[in-house]
Regions:
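Thiamine diphosphate
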Residues: 1-168
């Protein structure tokens, strides 16, 4: 890895295991340090942030408050990748309070899978896709060479030309 390269991975519920596995892949295969965040509720993080935002708006003469999310993520470098077994819109709802680039992975579209593992692979939200997404976000932020992303795609046997699961 280069300098201060670091990724922030978020997972909610049972997909947290895939997030932890992706963190291990990033560390082992690419020497990328990762912070893993267990998100119990994207909805509650949003509600808290909106409540703090409202308080700040109605108390302009007071010291602005920070939401729980903003407090947790302050000074945490790297892009943020949020993985969920729900649609991408669920983690997307916290994006405006995240202090860096943010990518959601979720199960948008129609599933054709009989098991969770197959479902996550179909929707491109398994450990390999989480790792590749983190590498791509790091490259987009200028923290990593794009060739590293291509290497990961090959290493994890991802077909870059397969149909988008949302369109299937």
């Amino acid at each position: 890895s280069q300098g201060k390269v670091r990724a922030q991975l978020m997972g909610s519920g049972t997909i947290l295991r895939e997030v932890l596995a992706a963190a291990e892949l990033l560390s082992k295969d690419f020497r990328i340090p990762v912070d893993v965040w267990s998100v119990t509720s994207f909805n509650e993080l949003r509600r808290d942030a909106l409540e703090v935002e409202r308080w700040n708006q109605l108390h302009p003469d007071e010291e602005p408050r920070k939401s729980y999310l903003e407090q947790c993520l302050a000074k945490r470098p790297g892009p943020y990748i949020a993985a969920t077994d729900y649609m991408k819109i669920v983690p997307d709802q916290i994006q405006r309070w995240v202090p860096g680039s943010f990518v959601s992975l979720g199960t948008d579209g129609y599933g054709r899978s009989d098991a969770r593992k197959a479902l996550r692979e179909h929707f491109e939200v398994d450990r390999h896709y989480i790792a590749v997404t983190a590498l791509k976000a790091l490259a987009d932020d200028g923290a990593l060479d794009r060739k590293t992303v291509s290497q990961a795609i090959k290493k994890y046997n991802i077909d870059p030309d397969r149909p988008d699961p949302v369109t299937l």
